[in-house]
Amino acid sequence: MSISQKRASEIVDALRRGTVPRTSLDAFCVGLERFEPAVDADLDAVAAGRGVFKAVRGDYGCGKTFFTRWLADRARKRGFVTSEVQISETETPLHKLETVYRRLMERLATADTPEGALRTIVDGWFHVLEEDVLAEGVAPEDTERLVTRTTALLEQRLAGVTNHAPLFAAAIRGYRRAAVAGDRATADGVLAWAAGQPHVAAQVKKSAGIKGDLDHFGALGFLQGVLTMLRDAGHAGLLVVLDEVETIQRVRSDARDKSLNALRQLIDEVEGGRFPGLFLAITGTPTFFDGPQGVRRLEPLAQRLHVDFQTDSRFDNPRAVQLRLPPFDLDRLCSVGQKIRDIFRGTAVAPDRVAARCDDAYIRRLAEAVTGHLGGKVGIAPRIFLKKLVGDVLDRIDQFPDFDPTRDYRLTVNDTEMTRVERQASGAKDLDGIELEL
């Protein structure tokens, strides 16, 4: 597919840093075509007002983060707001829903705003309300009447939110009052409080008629309020990704059980219709879904997420509640490398030299070499392979006319450039894999 030079540069820059790009992932994805019809059907269902839940299952290196960012990119192109929250035992524990909500708000993204889009959504909603008032015949120059009618319409639209999250509704009213009055500092503080931020000044909260901080029980009500606003503002819905949920296996047993119960509650609420317009996705390893320290600890959750994966993976059902991502193989790794090389050419000073010196045969040699350095495990190779391809090979070919990777480049992979999970996965797996000096 053809993409702009700006998009190509964003992809290349992210891979050079060893991270997954956030946009245009369909330009170089390989092997996800089988999921497209089911994913699009789910997005259509959410846009029509349903709630949808999906669990994405795969070992490290299968591309879970890539899949969810591909899904988010696809959703934003359809008018969705998206948010990716990385679950961790210290910064974002799953059992503290108020913290999950705060992270979710911090990472709200639209097609035009890559992060922190809450203000854009709220202001966009106010604009829609004003447009509706103008459509009634109120003159644009009649500022006083426009504000009065818009405020009245805001109260009508907030009626449903007030029932389940009165403090959220109060915060939105307070934000609008401060914004209309030109008090930006108060408006910012009130909106931060509505986004779950602690330590908002008492005077700011008092001006909006709110008090205290968001707690575990109020978080889901606030999420309902956000959904109401963004859908009323013309957005198709909200996609929330909870990434690396398997990390809850490493916390204390009481926190683990609370986290599993919080996940069960979220799934029940989504499927029970509390969150129309919400697509909730989680990612986890097979051990999380099948092991004794994961989903199986909570029987109701295990029942909801159970899918039989004993059958041939070619016939996995993309409509099931749990999706199994296939592991990377060498051919798939090479295909991705070829696509990245072609995207890089769109940003290169010497695109013809890039194509000539990094041909398909060299890409396969590099893929085999990286995989060999990682103990032959193709599944953990994609991130490092693409980082080496872009930063060590393609950049040098483009900048140095004399550079020939077959002659001038020797692959090295150091522990310092690998993630903890990559180091663990590439190490010895059993006693036979440990070398002893005798």
Tell where the protein language model's regions lie, with residue ranges.
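A short, basic N-terminal segment
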Residues: 1-52, 146, 402-438
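Alpha-helical scaffold elements adjacent to nucleotide-binding pockets in ATP/GTP-utilizing enzyme cores
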Residues: 38, 70-74, 96-107, 258-262, ...
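The catalytic "switch" region of P-loop NTPases
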Residues: 2, 7, 187-358
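Eukaryote-specific, cytoplasm-facing alpha-helical/coiled-coil scaffolding segments in long proteins
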Residues: 66, 130-133, 248-252, 412-422
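Conserved phosphate/pyrophosphate-binding and hydrolysis machinery centered on Walker-type P-loop NTPases
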Residues: 25-33, 61, 94, 161, ...
